[in-house]
Amino acid sequence: MHVTITVPEETTAGFAVAADRDPGDLAAKVRRGLPRPLGAAVAGHLGTPQLMLTCHPAGSSPWNLSEVTGDDEDDALRARQAGWHIGVTCVLPASDLPSGPHLARATAKAIADSLRGVPVDLATGRTLPATRPDRLDDFFLADDWLGTVLPPYRNSGRCTADEDDIDGCACVALSTRGLGRFGLPELEITDVACPHDLAALNILRTTAQRLLPLGRHPGDHTLPGELLLTSADFSAFWGNRDPMWDDGPIAVRLTENASGRLGVLPPAAFPGTLNEWLWDELPPVLHELLGWDLERAAPPG
């Protein structure tokens, strides 16, 4: 069965900086905090709908940061308790994707750095890690754009299924939180057994990368009944050009689970269960690669 997705003419992306003091002249902080040519690109958009800056005391802020999470719990706590919220928002035509959200996020990071604040991705509800200065050509989805993280191991110890049982449980449900700003539906995969959580995560990552180019083309797009995911798709997710596996493409089936949300399933012809497919049919690298150091030129292959 085919799936049709509708890419909007415009999308909105937003970030916030949680800070402990009034930031003063935001535009000046941005100009000083970004390297060229990124700084020049940002300066050309400041004050337009493509890059708007606002500042609010936390008590009257339009953004609720009280449930922000992140890999660094100290940063997450600081974000939840900060007295000031600086918003970086953008309304973007499809032609400005994915560079527009990239510029907005770089702006938020520059403001956070100047104020010793904490940048927050409003789509994912997570803090943004400190990384090297962003470059115009430095966009890749692996750089914290999907908001998808693995759950606590074995459901925080509550899962009692045998680890060697391929289909022993269905504890894991994963979903993206961030594709909407690229004009795309969010993706989810559910009923995954604990031992296959990383493979399921990498299937979501690769599917997201496969769909990403559609976000630049407004209108209806009818996808085939089964989408073919290639080694090049997984490589591009990491910002890499080297092959990540040697075999052919992986077929996945997409389903319309809800408005703006697609489910990812095994191909219809696969005779077994989701977990058997995750275990038996995927390249080994999808079971192995969780992340890599962003300072490196390429992920391990």
Task: Annotate the PLM regions.
Residues 1-31:
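N-terminal alpha-helical "arm" segments
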Residues 9, 45-47, 78-82, 246:
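A short, structural micro-pattern
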Residues 19-77:
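N-terminal low-complexity, intrinsically disordered segments
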Residues 21-27, 93-98, 127-128, 260-263:
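Short, surface-exposed beta-strand/loop "edge" segments at domain boundaries and coil↔beta transitions
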Residues 34-43, 109-120, 209-219:
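Structural alpha-beta junctions
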Residues 54-178:
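Internal, hydrophobic cores of structured domains that mediate oligomerization or house catalytic pockets
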Residues 126-290:
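Aromatic/basic-lined ligand-recognition segments
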